[in-house]
Amino acid sequence: MGETVTIQKNWQELIRPNKLQVTPGSDPARFATIVAEPLERGFGQTLGNALRRILLSSLQGAAVQSVHIDGVLHEFSSIAGVREDVTDIVLNIKDISIKMQGEGPKRMVVKKQGPGVVTAGDIQTVGDVVVLNPDLQICTLDEGAEIRMEFTVATGKGYVPAERNRPEDAPIGLIPVDSLYSPVRKVSYKVENTREGQILDYDKLTMTIETNGAISPDDSVAYAARILQDQLNVFVNFEEPRKEVAQEIIPDLAFNPAFLKKVDELELSVRSANCLKNDNIVYIGDLVQKSEAEMLRTPNFGRKSLNEIKEVLAQMGLHLGMEVPGWPPENIDELAKRFEDHY
């Protein structure tokens, strides 16, 4: 018993963040500042550095792998009536931001006659491929000039140089492109002191994130944290000690004991969890009494978050719009502790 308590103290007595604040930037789909506090001293740097590296290197995204330009044999060519040479065109193509839900590779085509500017918005996409920066300029055509390009798009992670994108059986005229798959463009973080009670030297971690729009900043952090969690599991070489439940008389309840579970224990995205927190929804009993219409009136709460919550509740045999007699009980905190092993 004593050894079990000592083992559990290794993680149970460390302070954990009770605040995770997401502040959207000018474009919420691309920019956000995320603050986590309080953290044990030193954990701000540990977590900030680990999450930053994962965000920039390990999230899945889509990018152009190669391009074929009609009439062009290699990237050191020039095209009649096109102001940019092929090398500059390839550099511009590398900056095309793409969102693709399915597996690749897939093809995209652009065909245009001059005079005028060829932009990423001129690309004819297929299926679930979306160009996220349609205003990006690819090249400029003079009067009478014409260009046709076919792009190969694939999914991956991190950065892949052009040399690795050249297949062994590449046809003449196929030009490989450097692929930046990561949907996260920039990540910076800083660690400051913060206060918790009378202790003044806990850590406050502030992360500033910019994405290409294929993923929201808060979701990118959630995915990075999940990757880190998954990688660390192999280092845990013991089974977590089970709590010894004292024999006690459990009172009868007028409602499902699952309603006493806190919503922050559900596996929800950061955005959904923050919306519930901001609406003072603490327990599942608070949540299930809400209608879909009431939830959608919550600030920053959209259809995606609604579907996520409905799916989680369905897995528990619950749904929105339920009537819960006797809710909330007067001694809800005490009941939640007594029933935590019963839901």
Swiss-Prot record:
Domain-level remarks: The N-terminal domain is essential for RNAP assembly and basal transcription, whereas the C-terminal domain is involved in interaction with transcriptional regulators and with upstream promoter elements.
**UniProt-recorded name of the protein:** DNA-directed RNA polymerase subunit alpha
Extract the ranges annotated as region (Alpha N-terminal domain (alpha-NTD)).
Answer: 1-239
> Tell me, what is one Gene Ontology molecular-function annotation carried by this entry?
DNA binding
Q: Which NCBIfam families match?
A: PRK05182.1-2, PRK05182.2-5, rpoA
Enumerate the UniProt keywords alphabetically. DNA-directed RNA polymerase, Nucleotidyltransferase, Transcription, Transferase
The UniProt entry's sequence similarity note says: Belongs to the RNA polymerase alpha chain family.
The question of whether GTP-binding is a record keyword is answered with no
- State which Enzyme Commission number(s) the record gives: 2.7.7.6
Supply the source organism for this entry: Bradyrhizobium diazoefficiens (strain JCM 10833 / BCRC 13528 / IAM 13628 / NBRC 14792 / USDA 110)
Alphabetical list of Pfam families matching this protein: RNA_pol_A_bac, RNA_pol_A_CTD, RNA_pol_L
Cysteine pairings via disulfide bonds: none
Record GO cellular component, one term: DNA-directed RNA polymerase complex
Give the catalytic activity: RNA(n) + a ribonucleoside 5'-triphosphate = RNA(n+1) + diphosphate
Role of this protein: DNA-dependent RNA polymerase catalyzes the transcription of DNA into RNA using the four ribonucleoside triphosphates as substrates.
HAMAP family per UniProt: RNApol_bact_RpoA (MF_00059)
> Where does the record place the region Alpha C-terminal domain (alpha-CTD)?
255-343
The biological processes this protein is annotated with in GO are: DNA-templated transcription
Q: How does it assemble?
A: Homodimer. The RNAP catalytic core consists of 2 alpha, 1 beta, 1 beta' and 1 omega subunit. When a sigma factor is associated with the core the holoenzyme is formed, which can initiate transcription.
